[in-house]
């Protein structure tokens, strides 16, 4: 599925192809919470890095999160003008980029269930739906990948 996204001021616009467009993964880690500023969590989508096209590249900056006394290898790309988080690129998975659903302008399909992950890092003020068939809870990361989740449900496009 072709996804188009942008920052708030539209100085940076991008497009990419995603086989995994369902916004199901809600991450409550402090990094996602603080870099996206949305509801205490971020919902990350996965896209093919070889299809990433960017307009306004000169307006991009990136941030490497502080982790375990050092810096993460992952780069969180932002707009220099308005500060919108646009995507994460991690050398551990060089074939993918991970834009937050909030940066996507294309209408996304509704996920049939949600995964709430990194709940061990959740801020105390953030409400989380009770665990159920439709809302799975994980203290850290689940074993199933974004790709695996989509494939198991026949949603991989």
Which residue stretches match the model-derived regions?
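A short Gly-Trp-Pro
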Residues: 1-6, 11-157
């Amino acid at each position: 599925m072709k996804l188009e996204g942008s920052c708030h001021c539209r100085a940076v616009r991008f497009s990419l192809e995603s086989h995994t467009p369902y916004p199901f993964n809600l991450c409550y880690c402090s990094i996602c919470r603080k870099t996206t500023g949305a509801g205490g969590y971020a919902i990350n989508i996965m896209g093919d890095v070889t299809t990433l096209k960017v307009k306004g590249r000169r307006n991009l900056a990136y941030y490497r999160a502080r982790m375990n006394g050092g810096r993460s290898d992952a780069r969180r790309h932002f707009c220099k003008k308005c500060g919108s988080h646009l995507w994460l690129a991690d050398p551990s998975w060089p074939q993918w980029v991970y834009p937050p659903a909030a940066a996507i302008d294309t209408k996304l399909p509704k996920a049939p269930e949600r995964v709430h992950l990194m709940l061990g890092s959740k801020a105390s003020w953030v409400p989380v739906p009770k665990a159920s068939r439709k809302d799975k809870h994980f203290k850290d990361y689940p074993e199933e990948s974004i790709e695996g989740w989509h494939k198991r449900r026949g949603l991989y496009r």
